[in-house]
Amino acid sequence: MAFNMHNRNLLSLMHHSPRDVRYLLDLSRDLKRAKYTGTEQQHLKRKNIALIFEKTSTRTRCAFEVAAYDQGANVTYIDPNSSQIGHKESMKDTARVLGRMYDAIEYRGFKQEIVEELATYAGVPVFNGLTAEYHPTQMLADVLTMREHTDKPLHDITYAYLGDARNNMGNSLLLIGAKLGMDVRIAAPKALWPHDDHVAACKKFAEESGARITLTEDPKEAVKGVDFVHTDVWVSMGEPVEAWGERIKELLPYQVNVEIMKAAGNPRVKFMHCLPAFHNSETKVGKQIAEQYPNLKNGIEVTEDVFESPWNIAFEQAENRMHTIKAILVSTLADI
């Protein structure tokens, strides 16, 4: 290994240097190639990893499980219905129990302070699978995907995020781009921009890396000349459908549609989404929204014609969750 990341937490990427991030990206690329060519070697035999999910997931759970199994590790999936976490036992006590049984712990849930408390008391590496504030494993997958779809070096890559930028995706896309010297544009109503303290921290990173940061309320200005257009759902998991009315009114100008993609003015532009996406009315939630807002039957944050077009690389992005998570596990836990 190029340098030592052994037993290190991954909580937000705030404390990872650009060199750390590039190393994880390069290791992800190498592990992906090894899997595709059938030359992968197992470095995590006899390792045990606990997966705590207070929020449900498809991609994060599958990515951690397959990554661990590929490398010879064992996993235990823990959901709110199969544990005492938060009911009869605090997260602090849970951390001190699991840390004696497992080599690492993944947490996907709500507040950032919970995953940080886990890391404080577990005594083993803790990985943030998603909190309200940050989504670091997704960021590694996103940058790996962007690298795969352009010949440009990282500092020449330009991307825009459209939508609610106060959430984990807005925060994290701003952070990773600032760390790596990229050109990052955030387009959202000003009330939905990332918090001022987070923007200030990212601007400081940008000064060091040469990154360009733009926050604007004009979506077409944001996407002009970009290589990639990102978005995310407009409300978080668990929010009632009734809460969508005001959010739809605020964010409809930031819907990723054909007009927005063409406004990039780049024939090689690609669309990215961390998924799941409401791109039609075939899901239960999509159908409920379409019943109340018929103009959204063909997509909410992204339209069906964009999602089902060659612009969309969200499924490659989803696959790369597994390769980048594998890199995190190997770099942290492997005895090499």
UniProtKB/Swiss-Prot annotation:
A Pfam entry, by short name: OTCace_N
Cellular component terms per the entry's GO annotation: cytoplasm
Swiss-Prot/TrEMBL catalytic activity: carbamoyl phosphate + L-ornithine = L-citrulline + phosphate + H(+)
One function term, GO molecular function aspect: amino acid binding
EC top class, as a word: transferase
A biological process from GO: arginine biosynthetic process via ornithine
Biological role stated in the UniProt entry: Reversibly catalyzes the transfer of the carbamoyl group from carbamoyl phosphate (CP) to the N(epsilon) atom of ornithine (ORN) to produce L-citrulline.
PANTHER family assigned: ORNITHINE CARBAMOYLTRANSFERASE, ORNITHINE CARBAMOYLTRANSFERASE, MITOCHONDRIAL
Protein name: Ornithine carbamoyltransferase, catabolic
Gene source species: Ectopseudomonas mendocina (Pseudomonas mendocina)
